[in-house]
Amino acid sequence: MAGIVGYGAYIPKYRIKVEEIARVWNKDPESIKKGLLVYEKAVPSLDEDTATIAVEAARNALKRAEIDPKDIGAVYVGSESHPYAVKPTATIVAEAIDATPDLTAADLEFACKAGTAGIQMCMGLVESGLIKYGLAIGADTAQGAPGDALEYTAAAGGAAYIIGKSNVIAEFNGTYSYTTDTPDFWRREGKPYPRHGGRFTGEPAYFRHVINAAKGLMEKMGTKPEDYDYCVFHQPNGKFYIRVAKILGFKEEQYKIGLLTPYIGNTYSGAVPLGLSNVLDNCEGGERILAVSYGSGAGSDAFDITVTDRINKVKDKAPKTAYYLERKEYIDYAIYAKFRKKIKM
């Protein structure tokens, strides 16, 4: 089957702590941190958006893939925060990495799983022989209304994956999706901030879809949790991630490397791609990964992945995810509000 030829991450350097947001709204930061298992989040600068994040991640993926960008036959950017309502982010990325003009490109939307949907689309095109390589990116600059619970977690970041058949660093053994019409989270056209169903986003939405997708794939592959060295799940907060991992039977040593939300917040479409990139940074050949995304509305994509020995040849050819996790500068709420354009004149 098709596999990952190159991967790359990008996280903005600015951070705001839960304590700073809670101070402004006169909330108890300790109860928020305990309830969400989130301590700080990544904030995009004034000159950063989904397009710039996607370009940086794509360039890092190309460094590891060591391919001619002209051989990329498809570019898909999954996000719920594309900078233009009518103007594709994917064409900006394709032009920036010198992949144009002989390719197809499109923007994808499915809440937080649009990036993994792009990976599946690239897998199909590569497997069919229609393209040699495909580039799938999950990136977001998520927003939460001032004072809303989402403001403590809605963050920015993304990761890119080049899919192909030759010189793969990780092989896709299989994929499985679970999808229903579940309105747990939404944003109307023209509205700046999303609305959500509060606790309804848990059991009937996130947990139902992630668990069923994971179980469906393991049944399809004939595997059990102990057959995997690592697992990565969508992470709207740290609590949901750990709980779903334990429900499915995974242990801390399997899930901890993919858990990034406590330190950068929920990067939405970038969440599973970034968690997976950190796992790949720490993998060895022969190790196996289960990755399961989730997008409100609602659906989950699950992937069974086996890492090849080539991983050690490419890990250090681009900045690792840990570099972006450690590269940070703290800002206060005033700067955060300025960067995120929360002050309307």
Swiss-Prot record:
GO terms for molecular function: acetyl-CoA C-acetyltransferase activity; hydroxymethylglutaryl-CoA synthase activity. The keyword Nucleotidyltransferase does not apply. Keywords: Acyltransferase, Isoprene biosynthesis, Transferase. (3S)-3-hydroxy-3-methylglutaryl-CoA binds at residues 28, 112, 153, 201, 234, 243, 266, 296. One of its GO terms (biological process) is isopentenyl diphosphate biosynthetic process, mevalonate pathway. InterPro entries: ACP_syn_III_C (IPR013747), HMG_CoA_Synthase (IPR004656), Thiolase-like (IPR016039). The active site is at residues 80, 112, 234. Its EC number is 2.3.3.10. Pathway: Metabolic intermediate biosynthesis; (R)-mevalonate biosynthesis; (R)-mevalonate from acetyl-CoA: step 2/3. CoA binds at residues 199, 239. Gene3D superfamilies: 3.40.47.10. It catalyses: acetoacetyl-CoA + acetyl-CoA + H2O = (3S)-3-hydroxy-3-methylglutaryl-CoA + CoA + H(+). Belongs to the thiolase-like superfamily. Archaeal HMG-CoA synthase family. HAMAP family: HMG_CoA_synth_arch (MF_01409). Interacts with acetoacetyl-CoA thiolase that catalyzes the precedent step in the pathway and with a DUF35 protein. The acetoacetyl-CoA thiolase/HMG-CoA synthase complex channels the intermediate via a fused CoA-binding site, which allows for efficient coupling of the endergonic thiolase reaction with the exergonic HMGCS reaction. Catalyzes the condensation of acetyl-CoA with acetoacetyl-CoA to form 3-hydroxy-3-methylglutaryl-CoA (HMG-CoA). Functions in the mevalonate (MVA) pathway leading to isopentenyl diphosphate (IPP), a key precursor for the biosynthesis of isoprenoid compounds that are building blocks of archaeal membrane lipids. This is Hydroxymethylglutaryl-CoA synthase. It comes from Methanocaldococcus jannaschii (strain ATCC 43067 / DSM 2661 / JAL-1 / JCM 10045 / NBRC 100440).
